[in-house]
Amino acid sequence: MAIKRRKISVIGSGFTGATTALMVAQKELGDVVLLDIPNMEGPTKGKALDMLESTPVQGVDSTITGTSSYEDTKDSDVVVITAGIARKPGMSRDDLVATNAKIMKSVTKEVVKYSPNSYIIVLTNPADAMTYTVYKESGFPKNRVIGQSGVLDTARFRTFVAQELNVSVEDVTGFVLGGHGDDMVPLIRYSAAGGVPLTKLIAPERIEEIVERTRKGGGEIVGLLGNGSAYYAPAASLTQMVEAILKDKKRIIPTIAYLEGEYGQHDLYLGVPTILGGDGIEKVIELDLTEEEKAQLDKSVQSVRNVMAALPAE
C-alpha cells in the first residue's frame, strides 16, 4: 500500500490562518488546504496560489490549495481552526462568545463529516470556551481536541526574559497556566535560563514587570498595529503544535486541555502543561503549586467558567 502524504487543513484564511498555512508548508509537514467561506473563495485561492508559487524558491515540496469547499479537506490528519470574528466596539463578551460558538459548531460538523479521524487545534477566541464547544460538538475523544494559548503566552514570556538577560531565547524555559491574557498564571518557579532559575537572575520587581507585559502582550501588539492583532507568533505557535502531533515529538508544552480532575477541575478546558505527540494530548502534567499559585489559578478558572456561562444552550 502506498504511503499517504500528510494533510493539514486550516479553517479561516485571515492573517493568522494564511500565515499558519505558509509556516506549515515551509516545514514540509504535509500538504495544506486553506479554507474560508464562499464569499472569500477568491482571496483564499489567491493567497494559496501565491504561497504555492513561493515553494520552488524555498525548496519546499508541499502543495497549498485554497478553497471554500470542505470536501477538499477530506481525510485531513490535522485541522486547525482560526475562523471566527474579533470583538468589535460595542459588542458584549456574551455576543462574541455566542457568535463564535455558532461558527465553531458549523465548522466542527464539516470536520467530523470529512475528517472523522483528525486532530483538531482551536485558536479562535475565547479559546478555552471555543475548544470546549468543538469538543462537545465533535464527539471526539478529549486527546484529539486541543486549544492554543499557552504556547503563545510562553513564547512571549521567553522573548521578554531573553531580552532582559541578553541571552538566546533557546535557553529560556517557562510555563504559563490558566486562561489566555490577563488571568494567565506564569509559573516563575518553573522558569529558567540555561537551567538557572529566573529568581537567581532577575530581581522580583522586574520579573513582575515582565509577567505583566506578557499578560498584556496581545494588547500591546494591537495598540502598535492600530488595526488588527498579532498573527506571526500565533501562527508559529500553531505550527509547533501541528509538528508535535505529526512527528510524534512528545513535546512538553502548555496547551488548552480537557480536565477530568487534574488541578481539581472537572469538565473544563484550561491551559496546562501537556505532553503533545502522535496521539494528541497524551498526558496532562500536574505541577505542585504554592498557595499563591493555586489562588491565581482559581481566579483564572473562574474567569474561564464565567465565559463558559455565556455559551448558548445546546
UniProtKB/Swiss-Prot annotation:
It catalyses: (S)-malate + NAD(+) = oxaloacetate + NADH + H(+). SUPFAM superfamilies: LDH C-terminal domain-like (SSF56327), NAD(P)-binding Rossmann-fold domains (SSF51735). Pfam families: Ldh_1_C, Ldh_1_N. The active site is at residue 180. Its EC number is 1.1.1.37. Substrate binds at residues 87, 93, 125, 156. It comes from Shouchella clausii (strain KSM-K16) (Alkalihalobacillus clausii). It is an enzyme of class 1 (oxidoreductase). It comes from the Bacteria. InterPro entries: L-lactate/malate_DH, Lactate/malate_DH_C, Lactate/malate_DH_N, Lactate_DH/Glyco_Ohase_4_C, Malate_DH_type3, NAD(P)-bd_dom_sf. Keywords: NAD, Oxidoreductase, Phosphoprotein, Tricarboxylic acid cycle. One of its GO terms (molecular function) is L-malate dehydrogenase (NAD+) activity. This is Malate dehydrogenase. Belongs to the LDH/MDH superfamily. MDH type 3 family. The modification Phosphoserine is found at residue 149. One of its GO terms (biological process) is lactate metabolic process. Disulfide bonds: none annotated. Catalyzes the reversible oxidation of malate to oxaloacetate. NAD(+) binds at residues 12-17, 36, 100, 123-125.
